[in-house]
Amino acid sequence: MEKKDLKPAGVFKYFEEICQVPRPSKKEEKMIAYLKAFGAKHNLETKVDEAGNVLIKKPATPGKENLQTVVLQSHIDMVCEKNNDVQHDFLTDPIDTEIDGEWLKAKGTTLGADNGIGVATELAILADDSIEHGPLECLFTVDEETGLTGAFALQEGFMSGDILLNLDSEDEGEIFIGCAGGIDSVAEFTYKEVEVPAGYFFFKVEVKGLKGGHSGGDIHLGRGNANKILNRFLSRMAGRHDLYLCEINGGNLRNAIPREAYAICAVPEDAKHDVRTELNIFTSEMEDELSVVEPDLKLVLESEAPRKIAIDQDTTTRLLKALYAAPHGVYAMSQDIPGLVETSTNLASVKMKPNHIIRIETSQRSSILSARNDMANTVRAVFQLAGANVTFGEGYPGWKPNPHSAILEVAVESYKRLFGVDAKVKAIHAGLECGLFLDKYPTLDMISFGPTLTGVHSPDERMLIPTVEKFWKHLLDILAHVPAKK
């Protein structure tokens, strides 16, 4: 199978086009320009708000003018993650895609099908005048991945739809009617620089090979957290020897489970062999604990050139203990919906910043607002006990399920008629923009669905090609059977 043969042709044509357009979160200017040019080319009414959200309108096909107005919605930014051995500049370089069996993936980077395949689907519908639909509005939001900025900034009156179809879900055959809310918690330690005494062995220890994944959609899988694994080893060494921590770096994005982390440390020269011995023991322990979920886990130890400066040992002790105590993973399962994670937390990144700051970013999610806040307060308490300064982000609301939704009824009936099996109606632990849309447009009737993606927010992201055509057929059938205006 070659890329030119992929079906539906229009969807994959536009997906390949937008893979050529750099679109990191908060840097979507080129994608906004692309959408404005697309609207002009097709003589479609196009407008852009102050945040950068783009709305392209398309009139109803003849005879469908009496249907309710549908908003198709996707976000235009993508998570930019790459393997350490890959040279790629997300600000300038296109995404290099390839076919692997029935899957489409990128070479060593995130694919951007989250949510590029939704964007491409909307463009294919806008460009094809043979598709039957009522009044249509295509909403393209900015910065979903790192702050839901576009959804927060959306103003009343920017769109006029009655129904919103969010195209940002990742399991074909599943229709989502609710999602978790979330909040970010950031802890900062201020450290002093100290000199490392003479006669110390310097080494770098690195955790890599983990799967990572989405901190909402994959948190229940029990995958390894590179920050937690690295900290376990550092804490072990600090308990055995006089440890100086010179550098620490782990994870990247608040909504991605960290795949890689490293630290550069120093211990007395006579402890050199013990470090290697203990790493071998620790590696065996980690492999035993995570053999099923993380078969490619690697811990690598290398000697380092001596450094003069390290983090003061008081801060190092408080940092390591806080990272050890900080929760990560599923905290509670839903008592209403079997199999749904209710509350979770992600220990996302540990970074050294200017002005002697070590910043730890975490994110908490829950379908219950009070439980979300309780989890954030738990994380705050851990880091405050260790002497860190903790701040919260703005947070975003969840989306409460409406099992009596009219468009849900249409979508469920359509799927059964097209494919002979029932679609699964579910809520999702990941955050979607839908909760924020309801704040501004409380009468919107919404569902979310999409083709099958795996490994999102990591270089393992891939899209199951046959599910794109099923998703396409389902979407077009829904558009043809939208309820009439009331």
Question: Which residues make up each language-model segment?
Answer:
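Zn-dependent metallopeptidase/amidohydrolase metal-coordination segment
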Residues: 7-11, 335, 342-355, 363, ...
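Acidic, glycine-rich active-site loops and adjacent beta-strand->loop/helix elements
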Residues: 76-78, 139-147, 169-172, 211, ...
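Acidic/His- and Gly-rich active-site-bordering loop/insert found
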Residues: 2-103
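His/Asp/Glu-rich mid-to-C-terminal helical/loop segments that flank catalytic regions of hydrolases
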Residues: 36, 157, 223-240, 269-272, ...
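Short, conserved charged micro-motifs
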Residues: 65-66, 269-278, 369-375
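Midchain, well-structured core segments that form catalytic/ion-binding scaffolds
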Residues: 22, 102-105, 145, 152-365
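Active-site metal-coordination/substrate-binding segment of hydrolases
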Residues: 64-146, 151-162, 202, 313-316, ...
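Substrate-recognition/cap regions that form aromatic- and gly/pro-loop-enriched pockets
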Residues: 340-430
